[in-house]
């Protein structure tokens, strides 16, 4: 592990360590008939997506970032007997597998090498992968190519299932059922893997509990510094969860202020970071057609640390964020393009979803020519990743990364 302590203390301070997930079996199992249910807009050319993801990783490593891949982390975690039992106890159950096949399936999975089991847990397990005939009502219902465990292609977007907020982490209850198992697997890595075991403070969230309507995803969470966290409240992160998150952060003494930004519920603006990200200093990039409509709510601890104080802030979001960080104003680089149609296209292709490696250095997709040019004109160095394949899941550099160690600014 890096010599630095786990924790993410800003959006643009030097990035020291990050978790990613290279495309693999889960993406080879995307089809035109199932990609919608698995939250992808299209199927991948997987071999090219892997090459492009390797470019993404290489750019980070070239700047000194320690890059960890969840495929390897999970494989190593599964080589620990206690961890394997914990994961399979919760993943291979009557509720998931049905009555009649749990014993045979569990006995087989207990003997698999860690890297093979990890590939099935992320990539999905089909009936034709089994060395035995499926049994029970569920097993016979599936047919020869049915999924016993559905694939998790959205694990590519490691940002969402957990969020490091200053010195601790949240284990996020995801909005869609297709993504909920990601949080369980990440929780196991944090609990059992030697890089994390005994070093992680969980601030909120538990993948073993039913959070009902309290859903939260990391694309909406930004620890911006100055003991403040910005949280998007839209399609994926609910006010029920954000209130609980604020309570937990205040009780742990993690922050003094939570700013909740209400965003339209739409596929194009599924998370705050699809329309707004930080680039360094007071420079941000934003899809202003959406960002200008956001309403901000200020949450702070109540008297004696009890309950929450809650106020709607009448100011535009950019002014709220500038004040929280001690700036007179933000320099906003809008989505590039001369027409509304061009700007909408570049936002759809994750033009505003950049990952800062350090102040003034970001990673973005190469396809967003106008937005990248605008950022470069503002003095931001843009390291470009091919985005034709990776962008089919609607996520850019920030979405494809879960920072675990980042400096303050």
Swiss-Prot record:
InterPro entries: Arg_deiminase. Keywords: Arginine metabolism, Cytoplasm, Hydrolase. GO terms for biological process: arginine catabolic process to ornithine; arginine deiminase pathway. The gene is arcA. Pathway: Amino-acid degradation; L-arginine degradation via ADI pathway; carbamoyl phosphate from L-arginine: step 1/2. Pfam families: ADI. The keyword Hydrolase applies. Transmembrane segments: none annotated. One of its GO terms (molecular function) is arginine deiminase activity. The active site is at 399 (amidino-cysteine intermediate). It is found in: Cytoplasm. Signal peptide: none annotated. Belongs to the arginine deiminase family. HAMAP family: Arg_deiminase (MF_00242). Its EC number is 3.5.3.6. This is Arginine deiminase. It catalyses: L-arginine + H2O = L-citrulline + NH4(+). Gene3D superfamilies: Arginine deiminase, L-arginine/glycine Amidinotransferase, Chain A. It comes from the Bacteria.
């Amino acid at each position: 592990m890096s010599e630095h302590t786990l924790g993410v203390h800003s959006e643009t301070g030097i990035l020291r360590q990050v978790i990613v997930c290279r495309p693999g079996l889960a993406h080879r199992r995307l089809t035109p008939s199932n990609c919608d249910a698995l939250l992808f807009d299209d199927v991948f050319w997987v071999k090219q997506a892997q090459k492009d993801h390797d470019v993404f990783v290489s750019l980070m490593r070239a700047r000194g970032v320690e890059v960890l891949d969840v495929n390897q982390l999970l494989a190593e975690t599964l080589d620990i007997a206690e961890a394997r039992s914990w994961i399979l106890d919760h993943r291979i159950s009557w509720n998931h597998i049905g009555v009649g096949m749990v014993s045979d399936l569990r006995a087989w999975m207990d003997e698999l090498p860690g890297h093979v089991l990890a590939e099935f847990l992320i990539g999905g397990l089909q009936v034709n992968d089994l060395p035995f005939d499926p049994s029970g009502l569920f097993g016979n219902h599936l047919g020869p190519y049915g999924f016993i465990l559905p694939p998790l292609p959205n694990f590519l977007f490691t940002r969402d299932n957990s969020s490091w907020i200053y010195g601790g982490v949240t284990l996020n209850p995801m909005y869609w059922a297709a993504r909920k198992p990601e949080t369980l697997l990440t929780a196991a890595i944090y609990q059992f893997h030697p890089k994390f075991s005994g070093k992680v403070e969980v601030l909120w969230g538990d993948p073993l509990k039913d959070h009902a309507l309290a859903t939260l995803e990391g694309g909406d969470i930004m620890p911006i510094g100055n003991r403040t966290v910005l949280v998007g409240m839209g399609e994926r992160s609910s006010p029920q969860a954000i209130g609980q998150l604020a309570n937990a952060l205040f009780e742990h003494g993690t922050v003094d202020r939570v700013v909740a930004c209400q965003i339209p519920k739409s596929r194009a603006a599924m998370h705050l970071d699809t329309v707004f990200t930080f680039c360094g200093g007071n420079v941000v990039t934003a899809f202003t057609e959406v960002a200008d409509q956001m309403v901000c709510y200020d949450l702070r601890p109540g008297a004696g640390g009890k309950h929450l104080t809650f106020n709607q802030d009448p100011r535009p979001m950019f002014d709220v964020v500038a004040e929280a960080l001690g700036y007179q104003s933000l320099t906003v680089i809008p989505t590039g393009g001369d027409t509304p149609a061009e700007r909408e296209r570049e936002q759809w292709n994750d033009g505003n979803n950049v990952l800062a490696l350090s102040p003034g250095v970001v990673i973005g997709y190469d396809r967003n020519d106008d937005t990248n040019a605008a950022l470069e004109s503002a003095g931001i160095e843009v390291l470009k990743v091919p985005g034709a394949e990776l962008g089919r899941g609607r996520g850019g550099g920030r979405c494809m990364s879960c920072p675990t160690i980042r400096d303050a600014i």
